[in-house]
């Protein structure tokens, strides 16, 4: 793999999420990553198709189209102080938010798949031979420890393909 391709993978951070619904907490985490990893040029939100292979997730969630629309709307408004309280607070403090339409994208890849898609399978489809950086919540990391949800092969693939950036979530320690 060429040096420029390697640099490109390291300057992109992937963020898998169900977005049920997407909110400021998701965008604030992406914003925090941009501040903490200034070499990051792109945050890619990997929107779930909602068909979880997780046997413990039985909750009905809004349609993919609605979740996509909410995420797009939230991203469009995020850095505008007239539409976003975090942007207004940042502006009043003399700071400009870094997350913008120009450095974020929403992957529709999983939405085209009409079956449960394992996270490891999804990662493998775009990671190639270089590790990619991925934001994961502590809740997802906790689920990775459950063999009903993630197989040993899944974990090997995730370890091979990713540098995980762990974020606190809910009451998971």
For the regions a language model picked out, list residue spans one by one.
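Nucleotidyltransferase catalytic core that binds NTPs
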Residues: 1-173
């Amino acid at each position: 793999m060429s040096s420029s391709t390697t640099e490109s993978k390291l300057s992109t951070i992937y963020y898998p999420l169900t977005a049920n619904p997407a909110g400021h907490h998701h965008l604030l985490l992406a914003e925090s990553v941009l501040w903490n990893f200034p070499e990051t040029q792109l945050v890619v939100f990997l929107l779930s198709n909602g068909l979880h292979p997780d046997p413990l997730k039985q909750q009905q969630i809004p349609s993919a189209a609605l979740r996509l629309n909410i995420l797009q709307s939230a991203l469009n408004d995020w850095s505008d102080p007239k539409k976003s309280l975090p942007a207004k607070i940042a502006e009043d403090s003399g700071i400009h938010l870094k997350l913008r339409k120009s450095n974020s994208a929403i992957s529709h890849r999983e939405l085209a798949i009409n079956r449960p898609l394992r996270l490891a399978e999804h990662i493998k489809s775009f990671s190639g031979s270089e590790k990619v950086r991925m934001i994961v919540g502590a809740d997802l990391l906790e689920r990775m420890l459950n063999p009903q949800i993630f197989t040993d092969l899944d974990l090997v693939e995730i370890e091979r393909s990713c540098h995980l950036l762990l974020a606190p979530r809910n009451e998971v320690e």
